[in-house]
A protein has these predicted regions:
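Residue-level signal for well-ordered alpha-helical scaffold segments within enzymatic catalytic domains
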Residues: 38-45, 65, 84, 88, ...
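Generic structural signal for secondary-structure transition and capping sites
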Residues: 48, 91-95, 127, 160, ...
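ATP-binding pocket architecture of kinase catalytic cores
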Residues: 1-120
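Short, solvent-exposed loop/turn segments at secondary-structure junctions
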Residues: 16-17, 57-61, 69-71, 127, ...
């Protein structure tokens, strides 16, 4: 829409949730657009992440400034620009892992109870949270959930205990990364929380198309442990793949099972 002051705006309206074919989803807490506005504000407060301005917010209504963009795929220039922003974002830290409120993932809310222990946070509020939902919805192959449970008891084999909390965007697929004339115009639709920054690095190649140009630039700002690529990248991809398996089934559940078996689950 274009109001009298000349600004172009985007209006997001949350319609009532339709009955899900999987009863599990209907029992979950509902996400609200106030959560999205809160997360956009948290990213804006860092001073390093371009985000749209919030003009008005209500539980089921969010009005944002329109961000003009012209790029659907990440060029090498775009990847380095994204790396600059994320490296600066990941410097922002907290005393614990989690966030002030749950964060929306599709129509459900992902828990973010504060925890001093990254491994227990990852196990309970990410892998097992989505694993239970995907299993209850019938989206996982036979034996996959049992393997996931076993894997979750052994996370310390691959993930160090001393990972620091970093503020992450949390949902960086290509549609949430907006460019204009080779410059990063905005990051939108966040699912923000404080996590091991490597979980964001693992997510990016799945759905955004980043490659060597991104990782080389990010590494120049914040050195990436070689063991991330060798041991942890696939492990950290389990959470988004479990979420996609929960919603869509199909090959996502198969890929989850492959990763679980790769780690001995």
């Amino acid at each position: 829409i274009a109001p009298d002051d000349g600004r172009d705006l985007v209006v997001k309206h949350m319609v009532p949730r339709r009955q899900s074919p999987h009863p599990t989803f209907g029992t979950l807490p509902k996400a609200t657009l106030k959560d999205e506005a809160f997360m956009l504000d948290r990213l804006r407060q860092t001073g390093v992440v371009p985000v749209p301005d919030v003009v008005h917010v209500a539980p089921d209504l969010l009005i944002l400034t329109f961000v003009d963009c012209d790029q659907e795929a990440l060029s090498n220039t775009g990847q380095t620009a994204l790396a600059d922003v994320l490296a600066a974002l990941h410097i922002h830290t907290a005393a614990r892992f989690g966030f002030d409120r749950p964060t929306p993932v599709g129509p459900v809310q992902r828990p973010n109870a504060w925890s001093e222990d990254w491994l227990s946070f990852l196990r309970d509020q990410r892998l097992m949270f989505f694993g239970h939902l995907a299993q209850q919805a019938g989206r996982l192959p036979d034996g996959c959930f049992a393997g996931l449970e076993k894997l979750c008891t052994q996370l310390d084999r691959w993930i160090p205990m001393n990972r620091p909390p970093s503020l992450i965007h949390g949902d960086l697929w290509i549609g949430n990364i907006l460019f204009r004339q080779q410059r990063l115009a905005a990051l939108i639709d966040p699912a923000t929380y404080y996590a091991d920054a490597e979980i964001e690095l693992a997510f990016l190649p799945l759905f955004s198309g980043v490659g060597a140009a991104f990782f080389e630039r990010y590494h120049a700002h914040r050195p990436i442990d070689p063991l991330f690529f060798e041991e942890r990248q696939m492990l950290y991809q389990l959470e988004p793949l479990l979420a996609h398996a929960m919603f869509f089934g199909g090959g996502y559940g198969t890929r989850v099972h492959q990763i679980v078996r790769h780690y001995g689950g």
